[in-house]
Swiss-Prot record:
Organism of this sequence: Mus musculus
Protein localization: Golgi apparatus membrane
General function of this protein: Mediates the transport of CDP-ribitol. Does not exhibit CMP-sialic acid, UDP-galactose and UDP-N-acetylglucosamine transport activity.
Name this polypeptide is given: Probable UDP-sugar transporter protein SLC35A4
PANTHER family: NUCLEOTIDE-SUGAR TRANSMEMBRANE TRANSPORTER
GO CC annotation: Golgi apparatus; Golgi membrane
Record's bilayer topology term: Multi-pass membrane protein
Domain of life of the source: Eukaryota
Ranges in the topological domain labelled Lumenal: 40-52, 107-142, 202-214, 272-279
SUPFAM superfamilies: Multidrug resistance efflux transporter EmrE
Reactions mediated catalytically: CDP-L-ribitol(in) + CDP(out) = CDP-L-ribitol(out) + CDP(in)
Gene: Slc35a4
Pfam family, one: Nuc_sug_transp
Keywords carried by this UniProt record: Golgi apparatus, Membrane, Sugar transport, Transmembrane, Transmembrane helix, Transport
Quaternary structure and partners: Found in a complex with SLC35A2 and SLC35A3.
Amino acid sequence: MSVEDGGVPGLARPRQARWTLLLFLSTAMYGAHAPFLALCHVDGRVPFRPSSAVLLTELTKLLLCAFSLLVGWQTWPQGTPPWRQAVPFALSALLYGANNNLVIYLQRYMDPSTYQVLSNLKIGSTALLYCLCLGHRLSARQGLALLLLMAAGACYASGGFQEPVNTLPGPASAAGAHPMPLHITPLGLLLLILYCLISGLSSVYTELIMKRQRLPLALQNLFLYTFGVILNFGLYAGSGPGPGFLEGFSGWAVLVVLNQAVNGLLMSAVMKHGSSITRLFIVSCSLVVNAVLSAVLLQLQLTAIFFLAALLIGLAVCLYYGSP
């Protein structure tokens, strides 16, 4: 039974165990990204260039793929694969690059809370493109599960945390005295719709080409991350003056890069052997990991809305993957 049908790929128990471990690891690493990034902040801001961190992440992925290919060269299929099979991954890298940059530009046209809530529409766009492009049909039960995921993400973004109460006397912070009002401009709404469509398209398109090609996953990743390095090097070179390439990097920043690189490789395995829908569940379930780490590392306080979001995620998983 396949992931799309609600099962776990693989017939043998060891393979099921490895797949389950991969899903748990990917969920944990995805959820750890934001808290680890917050620990990098100095005086309320990231001290290094985001473009250099992204480029380092892509380089790390590329090196890990190359090492994997060298170690397992004896298991390669006979014959040299035609390099034209690398071409489709250029579009995949371009879509991911556009998606990552849109996230930055969106912040100019709406407040962070509005972005966090409305960006959950990418769950719906991914599901729609998954059905249209890959020819899969979702049952009413599975459709309801995805709606619950969207609701859970919106709940979590709208009030899953609150700042710890400051009992010490002192002047109120500027952010507290003048909170940013909820707002979104017409251009921001258009960009948000574009972001959700590109997010869904990048996921579904990558799944499509990975499953169509009979090539080792490590080789496909090598193609993808080679284009990713080229694209992000161009973005870094064109980003204008700023801190040096490694300026501002700390131990936490290195951990962020390694975490993102390894999780990217795990997510590619999900796309190859699972589905874009599985990826959506990983991202949604990672909210729980994010919340726990934020509470432990950043002393943020969980609210009742967080537990509502966690309940909705649990219901969605049971509906989608449980027996009818």
